[in-house]
Amino acid sequence: GVQEKLGRLTANLELIKGTITRSEDNGHLDEFGIYTPSLQALQAVRSTLPEYYDEALRVTQHLAAGSIVGVPSFAEFDGDNATILNQALTTDRATAKTRTRLLNLAFDLTSSGFGQRQLMYEYYHGGDPMRIRAQHYQRADLQAGNQMIDRLLSADNANTHE
């Protein structure tokens, strides 16, 4: 449902915040006293942000549905249709003009040329996400995980019944 979709977006936001905090906590001071956050953590965010952004757009499209297609222009509120628009678009949570602004923003982000350019920016400005992920893997410190697997396999071999 709606809450599940919005919950995925808020969970993605918390993952981003947590990763940024980790990058700050695992950073270091260089010889000039300049603090640099952990690049490995930041690369993890960079590799997932385009997908998170795309998902946010899809959720917005789904929730706004047909409302974004027929949204009036702001000038129409000054014309003969103002009363009808106010009655039709006002909800218990937003005035007609506020709802129109929100729906116009949703349309701009999900369906206009501006929104599509922003999507391309999210995917490629920071670098090719596939390349970033490959570099992230190549730079990952997997030693602790590999040692844990080795211990589990050794324990399994010791307990194997043949």
Region locations from a protein language model:
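Extended amphipathic alpha-helical segments enriched in small hydrophobics
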Residues: G1-H28
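Active/binding-pocket-proximal capping segment
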Residues: S23-F32, G70, F74-F77
